[in-house]
Amino acid sequence: MAKVMIVGAGGVGSVVAHKCAALEDFTDILLASRTVAKCDQIAAHIGSPKVKTAALDAFQVSDTVKLLQDFGADLLINVALPYQDLVLMDACLEAGVDYLDTANYEPPDVAKFEYSWQWAYQDKFKDAGLMALLGCGFDPGVTGVFTAYALKHHFDEIHYLDIVDCNAGNHGQAFATNFNPEINIREITQKGRYHEDGVWQEIDPLSVHRDINYPHIGDRPSYLLYHEELESLVKNIPTLKRARFWMTFSEAYINHLRVLEAVGMTRIDEVEYQGQKIVPLQFLKAVLPEPASLAENYSGQTSIGCYIKGVKDGQAKTYYIYNNCDHAVCFAEVGSQAISYTTGVPAALGGLMMVQGKWKQAGVFNVEEMDPDPFLAKLGEMGLPWHEVVNGPFPFDD
């Protein structure tokens, strides 16, 4: 039995709260955000006496520590902004609480995300006897668990990994992002990167693409970009010769993005407007649709998986493991779209693994360092069934 504090009341925070409320292991849930009205709305939708709400500015470490201590939290699940990862980790250390997040740290003034800042907390968490589990959404998150499962059950060595992420849904908007617009646009407008033969290769943003066939969806144009799980996977699976990440974008989305970039609306530095300092990308976020608002009219599916190639018993082997998720089904269950759902469910499940002691070690860890079996045994029951194709077509032999 455990108490969990969830920080963040966006689309993902809502899913995490719904899923935690449905789990017997979580006896008390505190949903905290700068805008407490959002927390109250989510709590009302869940309708469980287990869920309480609170206002919190997560940048204020002392406020977070007090809230954690007053609540008696065993675990903090961070689904707020990546800018807040380090201050929330600091608060957990001070309050003596385990930590879980879904995205690695990113400094507000530089569009650059990497694990080094959080990995540097290893000794602090280990010495405190606390655990910090990093990147426990879907990608990063389930993709790392998928890869660990493949290594445990199907391969002696993994040589090639291509993570593929398709959203074939339709939300009816001319242009909108499926999660925080500021974070989303920063991610895809920076240089693409992939790891090959021990070296990081860099490409211009969205300059490499190919059609990839996704189950029950078909061919979709997929763009090579940098995604954070590549950094931890090449560290934790040193036999990898190449690791890449692909994501689908429609032509209309790319065109909108390029126009916004060309006119300066994706800038993250301050500009002066009518005597005030504003950041263009933050202003753009304010005028774009709130991602959670897309859920009601969303149709279609997502498909996220890992194409893996390596060696088992001296023989070459290919393996594909994936999940498809339906936007409308997610909305019917918890009132969210599938992007939020596929991130929030693994976060709640990762928290469950921690409080049950199945994933429990002192220090800072990525999900692929944990035993994948208990997590994947529960993932389908939690709403994200997964599928395998052994020695099927491998579309990346080029």
Curated annotation (Swiss-Prot):
The EC number(s) this enzyme carries: 1.5.1.55
Job of this protein: Dehydrogenase involved in the biosynthesis of spermidine via the carboxyaminopropylagmatine (CAPA) pathway. Catalyzes the reductive condensation of agmatine and L-aspartate-beta-semialdehyde (ASA) into CAPA. Shows activity toward putrescine and 1,3-diaminopropane, but the catalytic efficiency is three to four orders of magnitude lower than that for agmatine. Cannot use cadaverine or spermidine.
Reported impact of residue 104 to Q: 210-fold decrease in catalytic efficiency
Key words of the record: NADP, Oxidoreductase, Spermidine biosynthesis
Organism the protein comes from: Synechocystis sp. (strain ATCC 27184 / PCC 6803 / Kazusa)
Resulting phenotype, residue 342 to A: Retains 40% of activity
GO biological process terms, semicolon-separated: spermidine biosynthetic process
Pathway(s) the chain acts in: Amine and polyamine biosynthesis; spermidine biosynthesis
Catalytic activity: N(1)-[(S)-3-amino-3-carboxypropyl]agmatine + NADP(+) + H2O = L-aspartate 4-semialdehyde + agmatine + NADPH + H(+)
Source superkingdom: Bacteria
Family as reported in the entry's similarity comment: Belongs to the saccharopine dehydrogenase family.
Record flagged with keyword Membrane: no
GO MF terms, alphabetically ordered: oxidoreductase activity
Claim: Oxidoreductase is one of the keywords in the record: yes
Effect ascribed to mutating residue 165 to A: Loss of activity
EC class (word): oxidoreductase
Result for mutant: residue 187 to A: Strong decrease in activity
Phenotype reported upon loss of the gene: Deletion of the gene leads to substantial accumulation of agmatine and lack of CAPA, aminopropylagmatine (APA) and spermidine. However, the knockout mutant shows a remarkable decrease in putrescine concentration compared with the wild-type strain.
Protein name, as recorded: Carboxyaminopropylagmatine dehydrogenase
